[in-house]
């Protein structure tokens, strides 16, 4: 009679291997996240503008105007950081799950810098901004609930 124990353990080990690979990718992203902000041409702009952004409501007209003043640094930042939808020609549709998870963690941490920050409001704003599908939006919301 067939005993599934061996095949099941083999499968469990294989899944564990793949999860460990993703764990390595996530660890690398954590180490390198936004490192480009620490060097020219981004650092000078972020030194000047970040304190202003922290006092503004995310997504407000004033926030958008302030971002517009950073375009050179932002373009460099987006080009060098694939957790931003702007990095890709087709935005989020070109991202992988590691990119999306880093993006979500970035949005959560950024929302905490604003005096009136709220990750759920940020998700709503970014849902419209980046054309996030209902299904992905719900997955992002479910994931934020874990933090």
Task: Please annotate each region the language model reported.
Residues 1-147:
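Metal-dependent phosphohydrolase cores
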């Amino acid at each position: 009679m067939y005993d599934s124990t061996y095949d099941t353990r083999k499968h469990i080990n294989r899944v564990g291997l793949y999860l460990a690979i993703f764990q390595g990718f996530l660890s690398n992203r954590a180490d390198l996240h936004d490192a480009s902000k620490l060097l020219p041409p981004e650092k000078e702009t972020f030194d000047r503008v970040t304190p202003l952004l922290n006092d503004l409501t995310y997504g407000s007209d004033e926030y958008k105007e302030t971002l517009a003043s950073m375009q050179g640094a932002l373009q460099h930042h987006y080009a060098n950081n694939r957790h931003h939808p702007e990095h890709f020609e087709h935005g989020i549709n070109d991202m992988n799950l590691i990119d999306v998870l880093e993006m979500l963690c970035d949005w959560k941490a950024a929302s905490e810098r604003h005096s009136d920050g709220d990750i759920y409001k940020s998700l709503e704003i970014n849902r419209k901004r980046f054309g996030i599908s209902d299904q992905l939006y719900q997955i992002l919301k479910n994931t934020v609930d874990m933090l």
